[in-house]
From Swiss-Prot:
Cofactor info, note text: Binds 1 Cu(2+) ion. The Cu(2+) ion is held by residues from each of 2 monomers of the trimer. Nitrite is bound to the Cu(2+) ion site. Pseudoazurin is the physiological electron donor for the Cu-NIR in vitro.
Species: Neorhizobium galegae
Names of the cofactor(s): Cu(2+); Cu(+); FAD
Species classification: Bacteria, Pseudomonadati, Pseudomonadota, Alphaproteobacteria, Hyphomicrobiales
Name of the protein: Copper-containing nitrite reductase
Catalytic reactions of this protein: nitric oxide + Fe(III)-[cytochrome c] + H2O = Fe(II)-[cytochrome c] + nitrite + 2 H(+)
Pfam families in the cross-refs: Cu-oxidase, Cu-oxidase_3
Domain notes from UniProt: The type I copper site in NIR plays a crucial role for electron transfer from pseudoazurin to the type II copper site of NIR, which comprises the catalytic center of NIR for the reduction of nitrite.
Subcellular location: Periplasm
């Protein structure tokens, strides 16, 4: 490997090697912090000090932490903690490896749930065992690069960010260090937050929508370099992999497009569970590429394709479009038992690259909805 791309811990923290290879797309942290921002921190602190605080234990996707669908009482300060983990993961049944960058060890990172006008207070920990600098950009937040300018953490650092959740919807969050944003995001460092309206979800007529289950599907594109024989390469570290990964990324052609970190992660024993009659809210994020979720054998009864609950949901959707850098929500009442494939309906990405999962639904079959009038016969 050439000296130009030999990423030591020191050079990665300084950003020199990476910035030389990637023209920074995001304004530098120094510029963001030096913009002459004035704050009313004393008044804000006094107001927030009177609010109830709630500490939430995050859980790994596809599950979400316990929450109420309607806000109870006045806005709260909702406390979360995430620890950044740089870890090697296997993304398919062939043993293909990725040096992933993760929030709390999972791809995607955990789903956070609050109510509109709550304050999100995140403690972000970058252990000294990590090699890279990180931060977090919340698409749900206002100002300072979505919090990215205020959360730059080197190995061994901890930052605490607080922001007011003023917009209702499902929003992406992701790592966004200057000069390295695409690398971190396509290495798995993204997740989503759901900000519920204080009075809960509503249909297009303003009637309440209550869900029985909620699942979080995080779609991830990986770019794994190949050798001259077309086999996926393996590396000792993220820094060693970086120059080859960068070239693979620049093709804009992922080698894997997966749900929840790996091919088949939401199938078989890990299929999402429901019963006939269950009202299920499916949250789906894609931090980098467009996607087209489709439930084979089902529908989106109510769909917020770009995830924003101030807008009325679309009705009876077969497939919905979520642009890259967004998260969507679909609400469906299951009416038949069986295995439902939930896919990105770019079918090449679903069947060849891995963007597929399963719902396993139990209950009684309804012949009125579907029946085999004549079963297939030969001759």
């Amino acid at each position: 490997m050439s000296e130009q791309f030999r990423l030591t811990r020191r050079s990665m923290l300084a950003g020199a090697a990476v910035a030389g290879a990637l023209a920074p797309v995001v304004t530098s942290v120094a510029h963001a912090e030096g913009g002459g921002i004035k704050t009313n921190s004393a008044a804000t602190a006094a107001n927030i000090a009177t609010l109830e605080r709630v500490k939430v234990e995050l859980v790994k996707p596809p599950f979400v932490h316990a929450h109420t669908q309607k806000a109870e009482g006045e806005p709260k300060v909702v406390e979360f903690k995430m620890t950044i983990q740089e870890k090697k993961i296997v993304v398919d049944d062939k043993g293909t490896e990725v040096h992933a960058m993760t929030f709390d060890g999972s791809v995607p990172g955990p789903m956070m749930i609050v109510h509109q006008d709550d304050y999100v207070e995140l403690t972000l920990v970058n252990p000294d065992t990590n090699e890279l600098q990180h931060n977090i950009d919340f698409h749900s937040a206002t100002g300072a690069l979505g919090g990215g300018a205020l959360t730059v953490v080197n190995p061994g650092d901890t930052a605490v960010l607080r922001f007011k959740a003023t917009k209702a919807g499902v929003f992406v969050y992701h790592c966004a260090p200057a000069g390295m944003v695409p690398w971190h995001v396509t290495s798995g460092m993204n997740g989503a937050i759901m900000v519920l309206p204080r009075d809960g979800l509503k249909d297009h007529k303003g009637h309440e929508l209550v869900y029985d289950k909620v699942y979080y599907v995080g779609e991830q594109d990986f770019y794994v370099p190949k050798d001259e024989n077309g086999k996926f390469k393996k590396y000792e570290s993220a820094g060693e992999a970086y120059p080859d990964v960068l070239e693979a990324m620049k093709t804009l052609t992922p080698t894997h497009v997966v749900f929840n970190g790996a091919v088949g992660a939401l199938t078989g024993d890990n299929a999402l569970q429901a019963k006939v009659g269950d009202r299920v809210l499916i949250l789906h994020s894609q931090a980098n590429r467009d996607t087209r979720p489709h439930l084979i054998g089902g529908h989106g009864d109510y769909v917020w394709a770009t995830g924003k609950f101030a807008n009325p949901p679309e009705l009876d959707q077969e497939t919905w479009f979520i642009p890259g850098g967004a998260a969507g929500a679909a609400y469906y009442t299951f009416q038949q038992p069986g295995i439902y494939a939930y896919v990105n309906h770019n079918l090449i990405e679903a069947f060849e690259l891995g963007a597929a999962g399963h719902f396993k639904v139990t209950g009684d079959w309804n012949d009125d909805l579907m029946t085999a009038v004549v079963s297939p016969t030969s001759g």
